[in-house]
Amino acid sequence: MTEIREFWDDVARSVAFLSRIPVPDRHFRGHDGGLGRAVRAFPLAGILIALPAAVTAVLLGAIHASSLFTAFLIVAAQATVTGALHEDGLADTADGFGGGRDRESALEIMKDSRIGTYGAVALILSFGIRVSALAAFLPLLTPTGGGVALLATAALSRAAMVWHWSRLPPARRDGVAAAAGAPEAPATSVALGSGVILALVLFFLSGIPTVAVLLSFGAFVLAVLSFTRIASRKLGGHTGDTIGATQQLTEVAVLGALALAI
C-alpha cells in the first residue's frame, strides 16, 4: 500500500508541476520539492492533463463540428490547462537559441520574460502545425478514437521531457529544473517504459493504422534526440525552458506524423 500511495503522490506532484490543475496539499506534506523520483509519473500525469482536450475532441466530433474549429479548441484546452507552460518554454528557447551569440548570452535571453521574434515565430508554427495536423486526421477517426490518440500523444511527449532532462546536466545552477533535481535512473526508465507502453495501447485503441503508429514513434525519437543534441551544443545542458520545448517539439512531431500517415 505504501508503494501505491507514494506513486499516486508522484502523479499528483507531476500534475501540479506540469499544469495549473489544483492538487490537494496532502500530496506535498513532508516533500522537499524534488522531482527526481516523481518524474516516473510524467506520462500518466500527461494523460490526466490531456483529458479536457480529449473530451473536447470526443464531444465536438460526436456533433460533427468543423474539424478546424475542433482542432483550435483542443489546442486551446491544452494551453489553458497547462497555463501555456510548455509553450512559454518553447518561445524562450527559440529566442535564446536564435538570438544568443554564445552560451551565456543565450541563457540571459532565455531568462528575459519578454518574447522576441524567434519566440513568436516558434509559437505560431507550434500552434499552426498542431491545429492543421489535428484538423487533417481527426475526421478520419471516430470521435472517441481521436480523443484517445490525444492521450497517447500526451504520454509520449511527457516521457520525452524526462529523457531530455535525464540526458543533460543543468545549464545553470539557479534554474527551476536544477532546483527540482536530476531524474533518478529507475524513475527515468519507468517514465520511458510506461510512456511508450501507454502510447502503444492507446494508439491501438484509437484505431490508428500500424504504419501511422510506427511513423509517429519514429518522429518522436527523431525529435527528442535531435533537440537534445542541439541543446547540448548550444547550452551544454538543460533548463526548464528546454524541457518544456521538448514537450512541444515532440507533440508537433507526433501529430505531424499522424497527419501524414493516416
From Swiss-Prot:
Catalysed reaction equations from the record: alpha-ribazole + adenosylcob(III)inamide-GDP = adenosylcob(III)alamin + GMP + H(+); alpha-ribazole 5'-phosphate + adenosylcob(III)inamide-GDP = adenosylcob(III)alamin 5'-phosphate + GMP + H(+)
Subcellular location: Cell inner membrane
InterPro entries attached to this UniProt entry: CobS
UniProt-recorded Gene Ontology molecular function terms: adenosylcobinamide-GDP ribazoletransferase activity; cobalamin 5'-phosphate synthase activity
Coiled coil regions, renumbered to chain: none
Domain of life (superkingdom): Bacteria
HAMAP family membership: CobS
Family of the protein in this entry: Belongs to the CobS family.
Protein name as annotated: Adenosylcobinamide-GDP ribazoletransferase
Organism: Sinorhizobium medicae (strain WSM419)
Gene encoding the protein: cobS
